[in-house]
């Protein structure tokens, strides 16, 4: 087992139970073309290979790339790309490998310190959704972040990340993975979530406007919505809009559901 590197936030998953849960959550079949981010020692890769049509694995650590190539290089349905998933242009990289595209699923144990950028890489943003979208994304991540992603309104964990992610995907909390399932154990527990990208029946008329409202609305959780949005909407106008939606004008951002955020954004767009 290679020595984990702190600068890459490496923690080797060693729980067969967790692997089983990840595999089950991914709903894999032999027609799937999978992207694995940060395969590390290859423990998940080895489980995925017999279950899918192909795997594109992206690994930043050069030493691990050498090990992965040695372990899986003989599999003709395995492609290893060395690089940073955040800056890598997968479309360009895969132009000469048509048999590995289009990727339809993502399965990954992602580093805690780049969770939000990876989510944006995979899903896009409210203002700029990822097109074409993946069919399904299964991620092992920090438990606290996973809880924030799937959180419901009026809960402590509910915030801008919840609204933004749930706008772009159905978010399912699959299971928790204790720190002892890793070597070395991280300081916090992890969780597996499944994201199913989707298009809402009633989307935002102006996604950029909704993105801005959510960002400003959650800027200070202790403040009421009219205080957080005063730079773009005066209090009287906001009160009138909320009244039309039958929402308490003293509301805070975390009290609004995704649907209410969309209705609020759309109403603001139509009357502006």
Curated annotation (Swiss-Prot):
UniProt keyword annotations, A-Z: Cytoplasm, Methyltransferase, RNA-binding, rRNA processing, S-adenosyl-L-methionine, Transferase
InterPro entries documented for this protein: KsgA/Erm, rRNA_Ade_diMease-like_C, rRNA_Ade_Mease_Trfase_CS, rRNA_Ade_methylase_Trfase_N, rRNA_adenine_dimethylase, SAM-dependent_MTases_sf
Annotated GO MF terms: 16S rRNA (adenine(1518)-N(6)/adenine(1519)-N(6))-dimethyltransferase activity; RNA binding
Family matches, as Pfam families: RrnaAD
GO cellular component terms given for this protein: cytosol
Statement: the UniProt record of this protein carries the keyword Disulfide bond: no
Keyword hit for Metal-binding: no
EC class of the enzyme, as a word: transferase
SMART domains recorded: rADc
Subcellular location: Cytoplasm
Gene3D superfamilies: Ribosomal RNA adenine dimethylase-like, domain 2, Vaccinia Virus protein VP39
Binding-site positions, S-adenosyl-L-methionine: 11, 13, 38, 59, 84, 109
Catalysed reactions listed for this entry: adenosine(1518)/adenosine(1519) in 16S rRNA + 4 S-adenosyl-L-methionine = N(6)-dimethyladenosine(1518)/N(6)-dimethyladenosine(1519) in 16S rRNA + 4 S-adenosyl-L-homocysteine + 4 H(+)
Entry-linked PANTHER family: DIMETHYLADENOSINE TRANSFERASE, DIMETHYLADENOSINE TRANSFERASE-RELATED
Family listed: Belongs to the class I-like SAM-binding methyltransferase superfamily. rRNA adenine N(6)-methyltransferase family. RsmA subfamily.
The protein's role, per its UniProt record: Specifically dimethylates two adjacent adenosines (A1518 and A1519) in the loop of a conserved hairpin near the 3'-end of 16S rRNA in the 30S particle. May play a critical role in biogenesis of 30S subunits.
Protein name from the UniProt record: Ribosomal RNA small subunit methyltransferase A
Species of origin: Rippkaea orientalis (strain PCC 8801 / RF-1)
């Amino acid at each position: 087992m290679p020595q984990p590197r702190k600068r890459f936030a490496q923690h080797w998953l060693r729980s067969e139970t967790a692997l089983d849960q990840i595999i089950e959550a991914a709903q894999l079949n032999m027609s799937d073309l999978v992207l694995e981010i940060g395969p590390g020692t290859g423990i998940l890769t080895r489980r995925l290979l017999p279950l899918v049509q192909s795997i594109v694995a992206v690994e930043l650590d050069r030493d691990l790339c050498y090990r992965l190539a040695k372990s899986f290089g003989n599999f003709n349905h395995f492609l290893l790309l060395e690089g940073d998933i955040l800056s890598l242009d997968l479309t360009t990289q895969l132009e000469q490998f048509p048999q590995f595209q289009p990727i339809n699923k993502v399965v990954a144990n992602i580093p805690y310190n780049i969770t939000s950028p990876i989510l944006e890489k995979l899903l896009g943003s409210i203002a700029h959704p990822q097109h074409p979208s993946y069919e399904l994304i299964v991620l092992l991540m920090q438990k606290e972040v996973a809880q924030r992603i799937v959180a419901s309104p009026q809960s402590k964990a509910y915030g801008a990340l919840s609204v933004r992610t749930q706008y772009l995907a159905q978010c399912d909390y699959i299971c928790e993975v204790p720190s002892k399932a890793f070597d070395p154990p991280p300081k916090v527990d992890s969780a597996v979530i499944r994201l199913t990208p989707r298009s809402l029946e009633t989307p935002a008329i102006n996604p950029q406007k909704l993105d801005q409202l959510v960002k400003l609305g959650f800027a200070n959780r202790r403040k009421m919505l009219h205080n957080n949005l005063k730079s773009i909407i005066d209090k009287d106008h906001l009160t009138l809009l909320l009244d039309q939606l039958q929402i308490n004008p003293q509301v805070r951002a975390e009290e609004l559901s995704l649907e209410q955020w969309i209705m609020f954004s759309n109403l603001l767009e139509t009357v502006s």
